[in-house]
Amino acid sequence: MHTLIERLEKVTNNKELEEVRLNALGKKGVFADKFNQLKNLNGGEKNAFAKEIHHYKQAFEKAFELKKKAIIELELEERLKKEKIDVSLFNTTKTSSSHPLNYTKNKIIEFFTPLGYKLEIGSLVEDDFHNFSALNLPPYHPARDMQDTFYFKDHKLLRTHTSPVQIHTMQEQTPPIKMICLGETFRRDYDLTHTPMFHQIEGLVVDQKGNIHFTHLKGVIEDFLHYFFGGVKLRWRSSFFPFTEPSAEVDISCVFCKQEGCRVCSHMGWLEVLGCGMVNNAVFEAIGYKGMSGFAFGMGIERLAMLTCQINDLRSFFETDLRVLEGF
């Protein structure tokens, strides 16, 4: 009977387990045979042998149940291994990439926010004061013309630039101010390089007079352009904007031809990327600021994206052809 338990310990599956059970507990099994032998014994010898058989039978049944449980757990473990889904496998589903405009916006924000610039969000619908008058754009200025600006009946308009956000920020906050604004702007244009809706980014820094100089503006702009375009050359040109004085425009060496001359740069070797300058005192006076100085800059996000993604047609950004967008 000791042999039965030894055989039980070597069992590895249900089939072997059933064979051992029948051999031990079946009608013609070992224990049935032992009980049949009792009829040939008398008195105390019969009782002693019966107790011994009963003891071994209980021991076998206990060992059998433990082995049965162990085999069930083993088979379950093997089944789970076979049916397991390996979540570490690479997903074969094609994932999308970031839209060029979103990529460009995020890259701009990643540069300016660590420098302390706060991201401001303004309304798309503005009034005359915030979009024009406060920015030193008088009533006769061409930008107010119906051919360039979308007007509503209640004297409201779709903002033509993100500069109104600068005015709102200066009205609502006290200097020092460091802010950037990214958002949609609207003008009545539609061709290879213009769309009725486009995106701008503008920045503004304001502090007490004497604390902000043109050299601060120059340092910020040059750091940003080198961060965004890498090792390009920069060229500063004097310019005119009603809301800044002095004003400048900044060009970068052509990222397409490396200044050898191409159609994109009109064979000049330079590409215009932004405008900037010191905030005009007329702007400060319009909102009631006194004794302040500051600088502002602005650039088109589509323009930056076109240069980094080498896109020739601005309208590609707003088309729904995934074959085009997936190429960026």
Swiss-Prot record:
Cofactor note: Binds 2 magnesium ions per tetramer.
Native organism: Helicobacter acinonychis (strain Sheeba)
Protein name per the record: Phenylalanine--tRNA ligase alpha subunit
Reactions catalysed, as given in the entry: tRNA(Phe) + L-phenylalanine + ATP = L-phenylalanyl-tRNA(Phe) + AMP + diphosphate + H(+)
Lineage summary: Bacteria, Pseudomonadati, Campylobacterota, Epsilonproteobacteria, Campylobacterales
Assembly, per entry: Tetramer of two alpha and two beta subunits.
Cofactor: Mg(2+)
GO biological processes: phenylalanyl-tRNA aminoacylation
EC identifiers of the protein: 6.1.1.20
Signal peptide from the UniProt entry: none
Family, as annotated: Belongs to the class-II aminoacyl-tRNA synthetase family. Phe-tRNA synthetase alpha subunit type 1 subfamily.
GO terms of molecular function: ATP binding; magnesium ion binding; phenylalanine-tRNA ligase activity; tRNA binding
Pfam families recorded: Phe_tRNA-synt_N, tRNA-synt_2d
Annotated residues for binding of Mg(2+): 245
GO terms under cellular component: cytoplasm
Disulfide bridge partners, by residue number: none
Keyword annotations of the record: Aminoacyl-tRNA synthetase, ATP-binding, Cytoplasm, Ligase, Magnesium, Metal-binding, Nucleotide-binding, Protein biosynthesis
Compartments it resides in: Cytoplasm
Enzyme class: ligase
